[in-house]
Amino acid sequence: NIEVGHTPASIRESLLEKVLKMGDKFVAAVKKEYAPGIIGPFSLQSVITKDLELIVYDVSLRVPGNPIVATTSPYTKYQYGQTFGVGRRIAMEIKRAQEEDRLDEIVT
């Protein structure tokens, strides 16, 4: 299979916990192998089989997407009460880390 385009999508709610656990496992594995671990946005580029098995085929260690695809997540509104792009979220997280004197945890 080859990637032939980008289409934003949301995941079935019944699969959301599985997807989030995959992300958590990736973060933990990277932290174990390459301290301090991954800092910043990433995407586990995946496919879902007809049997609803999730298969990661690539990791994008940057803000995922392309200029044509919106750079926001449908879940941002649930967490923050509003919709905005990844850049604003990163800025908010940096500001919060500064206010909490935790910049050393998010900057290398």
Give the predicted meaning of each segment.
Residues 45, 79-82, 98, 102:
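Residue-identity detector for glutamine
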Residues 4, 8, 43-46, 95:
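Generic detector of bulky aromatic hydrophobic side chains
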Residues 24, 51, 58, 101-104:
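Acidic-enriched, low-complexity/disordered segments with a strong bias for Aspartate over Glutamate
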Residues 30-31, 98:
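Structural motif corresponding to the C-terminal cap of alpha-helices
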Residues 89-108:
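Cysteine/selenocysteine-centered motifs that mediate thiol-based redox chemistry or coordinate metal-sulfur cofactors
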Residues 32-68:
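Conserved metal-phosphate-binding beta-hairpin within the catalytic cores
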Residues 1-29, 60-91:
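ATP-dependent carboxylate/phosphate-activation module, predominantly the ATP-grasp catalytic core
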